[in-house]
Amino acid sequence: MSDQLIIYGVPFSQPVRAVLWLMLYKQKPFELAMINPGSSSEGGSRHPDFLAKFPTGTIPSIEDKETGFVLSESHAIMCYLCNKFDWDDLYPKNHEQRAKVDSYLHLHHRNVREASIGLVAPKVRKDLN
C-alpha cells in the first residue's frame, strides 16, 4: 500500500504527535507535510493555499490522496482512522466502551489542551502574542 494519507503539521505539536503515534503504532504508511502553525507565509497554516483546503487553519489535518477526503482536529482524525481501518482494539464498536473513549477524548481536549495552550504557546511562539 502506498502512502495514501498525508498528515499536515509539525512533530513539535502534541496533537500532531498523537496522530503520528497512532499511525506508527499501527504501522500504517503516511506522508508528513510540514506546516508551520499560525504562519501566513508559504508552508503555514494561515496561508491561503492551506486555508483553501482546511478552512480552520489548524494542524493536524489529513488528506486521503485516494479519495480526496480532508479532515482537521486530532481527536476527530484519530476516530476517523480507527473507523476507516477497523482498529477496534483502540476505538471499540461497542457503544458503551466507545463512549468511555469519547469521554476521555473530550475531557482531554477541553481541559488539558485548552488550559495548556495559553501557557505554552506564548513562550514557544512569540509571534502569536
Stretches with model-predicted labels:
Residues 1-128:
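GST-like domain detector, emphasizing the conserved glutathione-binding G-site
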